[in-house]
C-alpha cells in the first residue's frame, strides 16, 4: 500500500500523463535494459565517468546484477510457495530443484551486485556524492547483501547443526528488510520507472 500511495503521489506531483500501452512497453524496455544508465539519455553505452575520468558501465552492470538477482530470489520464494501449498511438497528441496537453483543464482547475483554498488559509491567524488543520503544507501545495500549472503550460507549449512541459528539470522534479516522496504532506497526503482513512463509518453506525443 505504501508503494502504491507513494507512486501515485509522485505521478501526480510531476504532472505526468498516461501515454498508452506502447509508451508503457517503451518504459518497460528501458527499465529492463537500463539503457539510460549509460552516461547520457541516448543510451549509447558511453558509461558513467569515474574518479579516473574514464567512462565505465560498471554501475549499470551492478544494477543489473542487483535487480535481476532480487527478481530471481523472488521467483524462488514464489516457486517454493507453489511447491508447498499447491503441490504438497515440503522443504528442504534438492539442490537441483527449481526453488534452490533460482535462489542460489539470484543470491550470488545479489551479493555481486550490492558489493559492486557499494564499491562504486565509495569511488565517487565527494563533490557529487550526496552525503546526506549515504547512510540510507549504505544501509539498504548492506542489508540486501547480508540477506542474500546468509541465504547462501543457510543453503550450505542446512544439513548441519548450525542450520537453526543460520535460519534465525537469515529470517530476521528478511523480516527487517521487508519492514523498511517502503521507506528505503528500493523505492527509487518505482520512481525511476514512473519517470521513464512519463518520458516515453511525452516522446510519443511529440512524435505525433
For the regions a language model picked out, list residue spans one by one.
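Membrane-embedded alpha-helical bundles of multi-pass integral membrane proteins
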Residues: 1-208
Amino acid at each position: 500500500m505504501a508503494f502504491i500511495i507513494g507512486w501515485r503521489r509522485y505521478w501526480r506531483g510531476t504532472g505526468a500523463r498516461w501515454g498508452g500501452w506502447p509508451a508503457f512497453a517503451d518504459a518497460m524496455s528501458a527499465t529492463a535494459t537500463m539503457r539510460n544508465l549509460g552516461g547520457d539519455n541516448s543510451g549509447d553505452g558511453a558509461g558513467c565517468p569515474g574518479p579516473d575520468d574514464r567512462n565505465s558501465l560498471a554501475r549499470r552492470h551492478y544494477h543489473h546484477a542487483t535487480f535481476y538477482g532480487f527478481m530471481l530470489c523472488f521467483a524462488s520464494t514464489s516457486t517454493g510457495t507453489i511447491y508447498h501449498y499447491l503441490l504438497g511438497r515440503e522443504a528442504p528441496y534438492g539442490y537441483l530443484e527449481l526453488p534452490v537453483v533460482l535462489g542460489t543464482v539470484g543470491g550470488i547475483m545479489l551479493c555481486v551486485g550490492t558489493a559492486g554498488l557499494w564499491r562504486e559509491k565509495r569511488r565517487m567524488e565527494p563533490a557529487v556524492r550526496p552525503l546526506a543520503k549515504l547512510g540510507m544507501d549504505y544501509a539498504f545495500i548492506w542489508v540486501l547483501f547480508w540477506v542474500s549472503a546468509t541465504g547462501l550460507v543457510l543453503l550450505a549449512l542446512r544439513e548441519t547443526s548450525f542450520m537453526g541459528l543460520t535460519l534465525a539470522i537469515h529470517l530476521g534479516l528478511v523480516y527487517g528488510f521487508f519492514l523498511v522496504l517502503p521507506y528505503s532506497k528500493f523505492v527509487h526503482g518505482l520512481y525511476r520507472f514512473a519517470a521513464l513512463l512519463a518520458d516515453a509518453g511525452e516522446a510519443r506525443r511529440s512524435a505525433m
